[in-house]
Amino acid sequence: MKALILAGGFGTRLRPLSCTRPKMMFPIANRPLLDWVIEGLSKKGVTKAVLAVNYMADVIKKNFGTSRYGVKIAYSHEKMPLGTGGPIKEAEQLLNENEDSFFVLNGDILSSIDYSKLYEVHKALGAEATIALREVEDPSRFGVVEINGNNQILRFVEKPKIEEAPSKLINAGVYVLNQSVFDIIPSGKKVSIEREIFPILASKRSLFGNRFNGLWIDIGKPQDYITANKLILEEIANEKPFLGKNVKMSSKAKIIPPVAIGSGARIAEDTLIGPYSSIGDNVTVSKGSRIQGSIIFPKAWVDSFASIKDAIIGEGAILGHWVKIEDQCIIGDHAIINDNVTLTQKVQVCPSKEVDTSVLQASTVM
């Protein structure tokens, strides 16, 4: 089986972190998001993944090369942003070998979807396209379907007002498509598969859905990213911390799982790490500091008696003595937060910016 992973997005809602890396390279439990996606595909029989890349494509290529977990990797490079449908047409030559159906995945979705089961359902239904469906309380952020008793999708409505949604079943960002779908996607232009292609298939009565339960999260906003990290930590490190190589940790440090600590990290005495925290490779956490519910990118420095809660700290950032950062604040790569500064209420600090006064309401420090 083959899969196309849409990996070209700009990740604008995750700035400033996405200013310096593509979203697919964001670490979750100290592994890139894309690594988790490809591993999940490999476990369900996918043998080839085509990555539709655009923004910072070279970073992805350098890190993933031509194979991972036994899955061969090829690249389809968009010369300009082509939406969610255009990349499918662009990758046609890489996907039209042998099999008559293939997967398409939104690359920023983390899920436990059983790909092999979805493929079997698609074949059994005789569908031209099958969408994995997920029930949510608020469908207004997503594509919403109206479905009949035969799992046939009658209508597809992209991001409706909540009172106008035909159901609470949303497009989970994973599809099985037949080769015939290539024929209805125009070449060389920006196309929305949700707004332009799925309605055509629904009108032909060849679009079906398959509901699933289990892990599913769309990593679109900072809180979603923090939540995804927590969910994966629960799976891999719920009873004891997941440690990389050559971690130097004081016997007087307190670790509350689930926690992941990367290779070469240094954890000093009287620190409290966890629960639900990822400490990246070569991070230093100094005496008396506390890190809870947060993601610390590699090579960051956390000085003594700092407090970090529900925040994201970029690569190489430096946090001074008695710094307090909480409530979904994002610190860009190589930023410097000076001693005694407090940041709260979703403050965003741009890369390499130095902050020497507290900011207590939502804003961007540029």
Regions found by a protein language model. Give the residues of each.
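A structural signal for short hydrophobic beta-strand segments in well-ordered beta-sheet cores
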Residues: 25, 144-147, 198, 209
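Conserved N-terminal catalytic core of the sugar/cofactor nucleotidyltransferase
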Residues: 2-5, 27, 31-106, 110-117, ...
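A short, conserved acidic/glycine-rich loop-to-beta-strand motif
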Residues: 125-135
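Glycine-rich hexapeptide-repeat left-handed beta-helix
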Residues: 286-366
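N-terminal nucleotide-binding beta1-loop-alpha1 segment
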Residues: 1-19
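Catalytic-core segments of class I nucleotidyltransferases/pyrophosphorylases
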Residues: 102-103, 110, 116-123, 136-139, ...
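Glycine-rich phosphate-binding loop at the start of an alpha helix
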Residues: 35, 85, 89, 194, ...
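Extended, small-residue-rich solenoid/repeat segments and analogous flexible loops
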Residues: 189, 202-293, 299
